[in-house]
Amino acid sequence: HVEWAVKAADAGKHVLVEKPLALNAEDIARVIDARDRNRVLVSEAFMVTYHPQWLKVRELVREGAIGQLRHVQGVFTYYNVDANNMRNKLELGGGVLRDIGVYPTVTTRFVTGTEPTRLQAVVVRDPSFGTDIYASVRADCGSFEMSFYVATQMAVRQQMVFHGDKGFIELETPFNSRVYGDGRVILHNAGHAESTVFRFGDTRQYRLQAEAFARAVAGERVEVFSLEDSMKNQQVIDAIYRAAGHDTWESVRSS
């Protein structure tokens, strides 16, 4: 969506742009330049960062509710073999990593404020579509490790777990709350004998995203997903594609 995001910014329009914003991190620099030249607000639509369940997870981790974070684990899968679906069209930027692989990375970064430094990955492509349909990733985040797998030709499942030395946090519908069930954050203690459940019923994360963006445009001090954040997240995705070509660690090139 880089071309039209730049055109809209050059026309003086504020832009809430659907993800994936770009096919590689370098292209996002063009959007940042257009934003700055035209003094407009441009934000990639990562709706999950506006959902209160993710604000709660960030709060719990930062206040030490699970002690020292050691590992983040994620999974996001669905089944789609429709050749006419844009997610299965290579020329339209289809593929599992650009469609849903961005979510385990962006939410881990959102919660921890930490960037992966290096990673290993396995990526499988569909022989007919040419798009990536499965990816398994292991990333070094310094004081903790992140691992996840995503797929477009597996039964529907999604989950995120933040595991510390004093407990762990589980999200049952981390990305599509209301579609596969209401948002719930479950905090387990170290012995897995007690748990606290935080419920987020009829929460409409897309509406919260649109409202936050509108308030920011109106001049209010509201946290919206920045293009700099988009750049960092895309750098992780770019590194995953590179890592798929060999068996060793691949550095995440941060700007």
Predicted segment positions?
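A general structural signal for well-ordered alpha-helical segments in protein cores
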Residues: 1, 5, 28, 54, ...
